[in-house]
Regions:
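Short acidic/glycine-enriched loop/turn segments that link adjacent beta-strands
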Residues: 43-44, 70, 135-139
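Conserved beta-strand in the GNAT
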Residues: 49, 56-66, 70-78
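Conserved active-site alpha-helix within GNAT-family acetyltransferase domains
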Residues: 115-138
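Short amphipathic alpha-helix that is part of the acyltransferase structural core
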Residues: 1-47, 51-57, 153-167
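Conserved GNAT acetyl-CoA-binding A-motif
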Residues: 100-114
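Conserved acetyl-CoA-binding loop-helix of GNAT-fold acetyltransferases
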Residues: 79, 85-99
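Short, well-ordered beta-strand micro-motif
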Residues: 49-51, 141-145
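Acidic/histidine-enriched, beta-strand-rich ligand/metal-binding domains
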Residues: 82, 92, 102, 119-123
């Protein structure tokens, strides 16, 4: 069985791989964005990666950010196409994202989830708050049940904005 490490992307190589995988998924594969998917939120979002322990390759991504005190969002959740069999990576990224935010004072954790992934999130103790369209694609605004995502020991790093630039 393949194993993965779920962690904050902290060094230049991890951050470059994080943005490259996002670009491959959201701009090239899904064509939700032209060129790349970097936006203003990336200036204050924390990137989280799934790393295949055997190869040290970044195979999954998600970002978290505090929209206002206590209100956190997750977004840009994606898995490398060659690693999509099963839900292990997505589940691990979601768990790492929500438990990390919960450690840092999260009172509510939200995400806009593509329609095809809503049932998966519901199995992970999320509820749909409303249906919406983003870039003409159906999504649900969903909320995590924080009681299933206990705080961990992750120390909140100081953001290094230049390192967050897309490569």
């Amino acid at each position: 069985m393949k194993t993965y490490e779920f962690k904050l992307a902290t060094d230049a190589q991890e951050i470059a791989a994080y943005f490259a995988l996002r670009r491959a998924i959201f701009a090239e594969e899904q064509q939700l964005f032209c060129g790349d998917d970097v936006d203003e939120i990336d200036q204050f979002a924390y990137p989280i990666v799934a790393i295949a322990t055997a190869t040290q390759q970044v195979v999954g991504v998600v970002r978290i950010y505090e929209a206002k005190p206590g209100i956190w969002y997750g977004g840009r959740l994606g898995t490398h196409p060659e690693y999509r069999k099963g839900w292990q990576i997505g589940k691990g990224l979601i768990y790492k994202a929500v438990t990390t935010a919960n450690t840092w004072g999260c009172q509510q954790f939200l995400a806009t989830v593509q329609l095809q992934n809503v049932r998966f999130f519901q199995r992970l103790h999320w509820q749909s708050l409303e249906e919406m369209a983003i870039r003409t694609h159906p999504h649900h605004l969903m909320e995590a049940d924080l009681s299933f995502y206990p705080p961990n020991t992750e120390i909140r790093p100081i953001l290094s904005l230049p390192a967050r630039e897309a490569s």
